[in-house]
């Protein structure tokens, strides 16, 4: 019997520093930059847990710089330089920023193509590779590796080092697998009725292979990888894929309760969680997401190998309406999720209508805790 503790709070840090001796993290992906800082969710497995030290509980000195943009993606390479993908408040155009790690002042910027359908497409879910290059798929469907350099004059520049057309625009999820293939998921299908596309580009063969999800299924979060495969959460189901001789192979699929509609504070009609691998032994024997059940969402924990649901528990034990638009912090036997119900966020273009429509109909969630015991 394995015990998985799920703790849910009204506010939650995006990353948790852990005791490296006591807990097991997913194995580092050699095609990605430093664990903890090379991607939005800490590592290829999206566990949001790192051995890096936090600020501590004492007084800290804070340095800030104002921008007319929102910065969801802030990454740091092995050289300590900060690379970020930000979206302008005015027109939602994405930009790459190279930031001074001491002052946070911009050293160089690069404008990216803006997606016509999703603010999450076009580079928001990007990562640093093992050469400190930013890897993204722009809104035109080009897989780019962007490096930075300093000239003799002291000025810095961002440079597109390589470009490969993968043929699929509006990519929202991006992650390398443990053999170096770059996996992606599109926001929606290539036609009005087809599902989103999951695929990968293989640098060894210079080929792109793809798999189309069932009709109507979209992807609104990033994707994750471990030695067992690549996890994708659509607006209807959780999947695990591996590469095959002719392209992506679906190992398993499990549909979850997506509820009657999109909830206020969430980007899509479906799960708000990027799948997270975790576990006490290998660091990836479990997978977790939340569903979109009404009124209470549930934390779901799956066996990575079989795809069987080994545990489910309501998001809050009080019966309060609940919602989540964030990946888990998952490590060992513990899972942490933030409650984001009715948080004011810019409405996603082409998002499904939200229900209930009035934010005040949702209760405030703070300090509630629940625990889950799962057999396995």
Language model segments and positions:
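Asp-box/WD-like beta-propeller blade repeats and closely related beta-sheet repeat scaffolds
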Residues: 117-122, 140-142, 147-179, 185-189, ...
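Conserved beta-propeller blade signature
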Residues: 82-85, 133-137, 181-185, 229-232, ...
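Beta-propeller blade signature
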Residues: 197-202, 299-306, 352-371
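Short, conserved, GDST-rich strand-edge loop motifs in beta-rich repeat architectures
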Residues: 87-88, 188-192, 338-362
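Repeated scaffold domains used in trafficking and secretory/extracellular systems
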Residues: 67-76, 114-128, 166-175, 216-227, ...
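Short loop/turn segments immediately following the C-termini of beta-strands
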Residues: 86-89, 137-140, 148, 186-189, ...
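Sequence/structural signature of beta-propeller modules
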Residues: 21-112, 123, 131
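Surface-exposed loop and turn segments in beta-propeller and other repeat-based domains
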Residues: 111-118, 159-166, 215, 251-268, ...
């Amino acid at each position: 019997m394995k015990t998985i503790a799920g703790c849910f709070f009204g506010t939650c840090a995006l990353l948790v520093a852990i005791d490296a001796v006591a807990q097991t993290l997913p194995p580092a992906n050699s095609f990605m930059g430093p664990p903890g800082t090379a991607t939005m969710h800490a590592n290829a497995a999206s566990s949001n847990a790192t051995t890096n030290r936090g600020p501590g509980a004492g007084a800290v000195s804070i340095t800030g710089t104002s921008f007319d943009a929102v910065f969801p993606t802030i990454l740091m390479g092995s050289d300590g330089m900060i690379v970020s993908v930000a979206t302008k408040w005015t027109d939602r155009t994405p930009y790459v920023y190279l930031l001074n790690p001491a002052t946070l002042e911009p050293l160089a910027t690069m404008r990216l193509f803006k997606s016509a359908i999703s603010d999450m497409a076009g580079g928001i879910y990007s990562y640093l590779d093992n050469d400190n290059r930013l890897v993204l798929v722009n809104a035109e469907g080009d897989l780019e590796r962007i490096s930075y350099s300093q000239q003799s004059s002291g000025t810095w520049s961002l440079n597109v080092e390589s470009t490969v057309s993968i043929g699929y625009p509006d990519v929202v999820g991006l992650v390398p697998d443990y053999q170096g293939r770059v996996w992606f998921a599109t926001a929606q299908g290539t036609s009005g009725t087809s599902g989103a596309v999951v695929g990968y580009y293989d640098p060894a063969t210079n080929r792109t292979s793809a798999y189309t999800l069932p009709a109507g299924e979209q992807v609104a979060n990033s994707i994750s990888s471990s030695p067992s495969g690549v996890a994708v959460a659509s607006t209807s189901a959780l999947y695990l894929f591996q590469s095959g001789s002719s392209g992506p192979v679906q190992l398993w699929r499990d549909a979850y309760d997506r509820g009657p509609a999109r909830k206020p504070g969430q980007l899509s009609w479906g799960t708000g969680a990027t799948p997270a691998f975790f576990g006490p032994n290998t660091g990836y024997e479990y997978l977790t997401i939340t569903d979109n059940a009404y009124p209470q969402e549930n934390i779901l924990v799956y066996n990575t190998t079989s795809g069987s649901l080994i545990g489910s528990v309501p998001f809050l034990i009080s019966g309060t309406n609940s919602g989540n638009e964030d990946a888990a912090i998952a490590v060992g036997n513990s899972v942490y999720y933030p409650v984001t119900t009715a948080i004011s966020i810019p409405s996603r273009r082409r998002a499904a209508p939200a229900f209930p429509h009035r934010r005040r109909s949702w209760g405030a969630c703070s300090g509630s805790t629940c625990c889950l015991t799962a057999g396995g």
